Amino acid sequence: MNILRSLILVVPILCVISCDSNSKKSSIAKVAVVFQEDSLKFTKSQKVFIRDVISKSEKEVRNFLPNLPDSIKVIVEAVDWDLDIVNGVTGRTETNHPPLVLVQISHNYKGGVIESVYQGIKATVFHEFHHLSRGWAIQDNKFSYGIPNAMVNEGLAVAFTEIYTGNINDVNSYPKEADRWVKEILALPLDADYAQWVMGEHPDGRTYIGYRTGNFLVRRAMKKSGKSILELSDLMPNEIIKLAGY
């Protein structure tokens, strides 16, 4: 009887502790949006809208990738760049510790800032937050050097974004020669030029080779292994390359 009485008293206490712990975790797991403005400004309504889109996107990504770090900071900057090929928005994952993502929104994109947000910011958040979930960042990257690692990590982020947002850009599409491109990348030296092979233009005229080839590689790994994009996102680059048959 005493044991039963003790259990009756202890269980509610444990529930309170557990609920309080979950509540604290929920309150921490959020994104802080900061606007960096120079000559180009955001209006008050634009800021409210942008912040709302980023916040909702963060919640969606966290449902898919529960290991996404807490307390992410997103710095949003207004730019006059030509970002038409990426729906008016671009970004980069700067650091893992603290989790920091930079987003640039073009004032020159078609209908303006709000149109950019509608078309591109959700896709950018999904892409960059996928990088955060894996530790793929510019300043404190968790992966070793080499274009193959970049190909896989960018390919995962591209495929994840396309699958869960439906936002597909031609700049990330892969050609029929993609298999040959993968083999080219796997044969590259560790010090191969990142700009040429991943996110810029190659001397032979090809563009964004790493993103496009990575998208192909990840899709092929999914098809051959039967694994989902979320399952692949838990694997190391060399494992994904093997699953794709290379």
For each predicted feature, which ranges?
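C-terminal motif of bacterial Sec signal peptides marking the signal peptidase cleavage site
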Residues: 15-18
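Short pre-active-site segment immediately N-terminal to the catalytic Zn-binding motif
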Residues: 107-124, 148
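Acidic/histidine-rich, surface-exposed loop or edge segments in extracytoplasmic proteins
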Residues: 27-45
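Pan-zinc metallopeptidase signature
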Residues: 189-246
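Post-HExxH zinc-binding segment in Zn-dependent metallohydrolases
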Residues: 145-180
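Auxiliary, metal-adjacent structural segments of Zn-dependent hydrolase domains
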Residues: 50-101
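Active-site recognition of the HExxH zinc-binding catalytic motif
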Residues: 119-136, 158
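Bacterial signal peptide processing site
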Residues: 20-22
